[in-house]
Design a protein with these regions (language model features):
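Conserved acidic donor-binding segment of nucleotide-sugar-dependent glycosyltransferases
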Residues: 121, 131-142, 149-155
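Active-site donor-binding acidic/aromatic loop of nucleotide-activated sugar
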Residues: 53-56, 66-76, 82
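Conserved donor-binding/catalytic core segment of Leloir-type glycosyltransferases
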Residues: 6-23, 29-32
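Acidic donor-binding loop of glycosyltransferase active sites
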Residues: 84-99, 115
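Short hydrophobic beta-strand element within catalytic cores of glycosyltransferases
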Residues: 107, 112, 116-119
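A charged, aromatic-enriched C-terminal amphipathic alpha-helix characteristic of glycosyltransferases
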Residues: 139, 153-182
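Nucleotide-sugar-dependent
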Residues: 94-108, 126-127
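A structural motif in glycosyltransferase catalytic domains
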Residues: 13, 28-32, 45, 144, ...
């Protein structure tokens, strides 16, 4: 049995991000469908945010029959609440001609809550992860599904590394605040 099933967390995965194509929500949904089909594992996924992709994502939830697994959370819900109810933060961003993903501050916020992160090697999100999660090839569903299963099976190891990773940013923030006080 998977380690993660023992947890009291409501969601296995969450994404805190504007609902835009480049954030990769659609890839997570497709991956959840594949995992359910191939491993008979129904993972719960919380999506916090709003944006132009909302209706398309809801259509994908229907298409893949993930209604019982996926929750769209109102935008005014604090991200901290979703992080505290979730096990893993996932953002498999894709590069589009119009835009490229920036640093990925949500991944650092999630790490502060002990959430391992799964990101793609697209844009700046690669800098927001170290050994506190998995980096996958952009647009690679097999990579994404394998990363989800790997992190869920080794959740406590990745959670511990996430707390350690987030501490690096706390120290940098304290140093910056100190230097700015002069």
């Amino acid at each position: 049995s998977l380690e993660a099933t023992k947890s009291k967390k409501r969601y296995d995965l969450c994404t805190v991000a504007r609902l835009e194509y480049r954030k990769g929500h659609h890839l997570v949904l497709e991956s959840l469908y594949q995992i359910k089909k191939n491993y008979n594992l129904s993972l719960k996924y919380a999506i916090l945010g709003n944006g132009p992709e909302l209706s398309r994502l809801k259509d994908l939830v229907m298409k893949y029959n993930l209604i019982k697994q996926v929750s769209f959370i109102e935008e005014n819900t604090p991200s901290s609440k979703i992080y505290s109810l979730s096990k893993i933060h996932i953002m498999p961003t894709v590069t589009t001609p119009q835009s490229i993903e920036g640093f990925g501050i949500a991944n650092v916020e999630a790490a502060a809550f002990g959430l391992p992160c799964i990101v793609s090697d697209s844009g700046g999100t690669a800098e927001s992860i170290n050994d506190n999660g998995k980096m996958i090839k952009e647009n690679n569903l097999i990579d994404l599904s394998n990363a989800i299963l790997e992190v869920i099976e080794n959740l406590s190891k990745y959670s511990k590394k996430s707390h350690q990773f987030a501490k690096r940013f706390e120290n940098k923030k304290k140093i910056r605040e100190y230097l700015n006080s002069f």
